[in-house]
Amino acid sequence: MNNKRALKRGEEGENLVASFLDKDSSYHRLINNLILLGENNVSHQIDHILIRNNGIFVIETKNYYGEIIGNEDDSFWTRSYFVKGKRKSVSFHNPLKQNKSHIKAIKKVIGNSFPIYCFVVFTQNNAEGIDLFNVCGPESLLTRINLITIDKELTKSQIETIEQLLLDNEAYLSSDDHVNKIKEVEKDRKSHQKEIRAAIEKRVCPKCGNKLEIKQDSLCCPK
């Protein structure tokens, strides 16, 4: 699937989930497609943020076809499908972990005083094999959200304040800028890892520059 088709498919999925969230009968605020800057100026494109009396719900939408396979702690999940009678599998980053990084960016803006929940929605209802409460199809999303209770519900004023804080901190980046920022961070990370490996190969501590010593068959910094 080329980038334009993938982008269009993603937008279709996000619009579908937004239409279900708009049906929420409780007092709420819904923010779709918000970009925030997190740690190290990394941009986070968040599909949906639903703010209501029982908390803040950060929702990642995946409009993937094929059978979805994965566990909560896996780094990657897999979607498996057939092409011309042959099974094909493609891995993708665990969306729960992806969404939890978005939550960190949100907490950077609003603090830690409010309950925040992570949900992942597969619009094709093809994640039945993942037995997690916060992974579902769009039809059951609001039902699951309504099951969550908290000791002290958010007031109307708090809901509106949270919404305004998030909107005031929105980073106005194009999709291309967002992708480029991610690429820059990944490039810096790989470059840093390369520098560390090069230092270790020279038996030099990458942190302090001291010569590494061999202790119990391992290289260790004398400091």
Ranges and model annotations:
Residues 1-44, 51-56, 62-70, 81-223:
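Surface-exposed interaction regions that form or flank ligand-binding interfaces
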Residues 76-78:
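A short, glycine/acidic-enriched catalytic loop
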